[in-house]
């Protein structure tokens, strides 16, 4: 099959928005990057908290961490997106729910729902990576810290977590890349990200190959930058002889 490529389509004026088709994709690129960064901040913070809880010698706290992981890992992500956008606002206090649904700009509604959903979903995966990293450390590190008079929180803060951070960099790279790819699902609830803009470009120009090739390259570019940055971080924090070092 012969494909008639026309990359000049991106420089043509879009039907609305006072911009070109390339401007549409650039706008979607910015939304995708913003969503990925904000969702990752949520995922990192929440995931680390619950990951630590899963390793503490307290059955209630560790059970709480397990419940969180099982809840978010075992429900399809697209279902979670629609739950956060359509169901959760109905469960909020009446005034807050009405403000979110009636007064907040729809684009902000889409973004906030997507950010929270993607962040909490990814946090469950981060939680497991943190748990695995802490449990992979030699047991003697924790015992030695406690024997020196440190409390359990101090042992985590000064001994276990600094070493776990170094172990966890490679799997965190994968989770960040997965988050970027999963962000495309946000277009199903109305967020105008790269995937949505590519769909618009296809609808108005009928150039499917060009539009989806362009966003494919954009996703590859974002993840390539993540890989490069995290590779530098991994080399920076690596300690000779430590777990995970070469």
Model-derived segments and their meaning:
Residues 1-246:
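Transmembrane alpha-helices and adjacent helix-loop boundaries
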């Amino acid at each position: 099959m012969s494909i008639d490529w026309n990359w000049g389509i991106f420089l043509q004026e879009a039907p609305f928005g006072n911009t070109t088709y390339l401007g549409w994709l650039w706008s979607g690129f910015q939304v995708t990057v913003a969503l990925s960064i904000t969702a990752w901040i949520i995922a990192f913070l929440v995931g680390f908290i619950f990951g630590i809880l899963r390793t503490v010698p307290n059955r209630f706290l560790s059970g709480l961490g397990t419940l969180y992981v099982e809840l978010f890992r075992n429900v399809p992500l697209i279902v979670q997106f629609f739950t956060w956008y359509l169901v959760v606002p109905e469960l909020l206090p009446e005034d807050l729910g009405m403000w979110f649904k009636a007064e907040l700009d729809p684009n902000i509604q889409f973004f906030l729902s997507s950010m929270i959903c993607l962040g909490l979903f990814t946090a469950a995966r981060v939680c497991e990576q943190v748990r695995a990293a802490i449990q992979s450390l030699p047991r003697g590190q924790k015992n030695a810290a406690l024997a020196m008079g440190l409390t359990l929180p101090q042992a985590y803060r000064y001994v276990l977590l600094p070493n776990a951070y170094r172990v966890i960099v490679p799997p965190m790279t994968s989770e960040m890349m997965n988050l970027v790819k999963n962000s495309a699902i946000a277009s199903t609830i109305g967020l105008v990200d790269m995937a949505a803009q590519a769909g618009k470009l296809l609808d108005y120009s009928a150039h499917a190959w060009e539009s989806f090739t362009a966003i494919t390259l954009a996703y590859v570019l974002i993840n390539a930058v993540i890989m490069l940055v995290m590779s530098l971080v991994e080399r920076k924090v690596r300690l000779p002889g430590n777990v995970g070092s070469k």
